[in-house]
């Protein structure tokens, strides 16, 4: 049985997100929040992957840097009425329109649950890689040095109803 991911099913003003099951970055110091997002990036959701392009002084989708996962601190002001799906970093809500996302470097073995994948069906064993928009998708070309994750479990997000998958990083 496969899990079907469809952004349209999230609802109005809802966003995909990440549940960090076992991420090494907070323990080994690969947490970065120093580079602004490229001018053409308008929204970043947790679980989107960006290139940490230090040479050009920005995070983007096409640079020379390593793929890193956006994992911003959520700014939710009423936990009774809001959930993880209510948060995204939006350029038009930032001071002077400059987004500086917090990103996590990934290593093989990292495990996380997410619904931030391209629309489609995913089964245990599927391999996913970041697409041109930083969203993980199946069927992409795997070049040397590309981030590759494997679907290790078909599951739901912490709300118990939104379909999601548990991923393990195979190469970063």
Regions found by a protein language model. Name each.
Residues 1-172:
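Surface-exposed, low-hydrophobicity beta-strand/loop segments enriched in small/polar/acidic residues
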């Amino acid at each position: 049985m496969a899990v079907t991911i469809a952004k349209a099913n999230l609802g109005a003003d809802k966003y995909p997100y990440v549940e960090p099951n076992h991420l090494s970055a907070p323990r080994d110091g690969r947490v970065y929040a120093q580079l602004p997002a490229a001018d053409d990036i308008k929204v970043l959701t947790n679980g989107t992957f960006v290139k940490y392009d230090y040479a050009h002084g920005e995070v983007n989708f096409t640079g020379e840097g390593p793929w890193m996962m956006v994992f911003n601190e959520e700014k939710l002001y009423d936990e009774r009425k809001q959930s993880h799906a209510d948060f995204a970093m939006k350029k038009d809500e930032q001071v002077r329109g400059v987004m500086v996302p917090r990103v996590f470097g990934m290593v093989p073995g990292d495990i996380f649950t997410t619904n931030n994948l391209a629309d489609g069906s995913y089964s245990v064993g599927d391999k996913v890689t970041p697409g041109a928009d930083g969203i993980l998708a199946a069927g992409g070309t795997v070049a040397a040095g590309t981030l590759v994750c494997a679907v290790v479990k078909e599951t739901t997000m912490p709300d118990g109803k939104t379909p999601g998958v548990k991923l393990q990083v195979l190469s970063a």
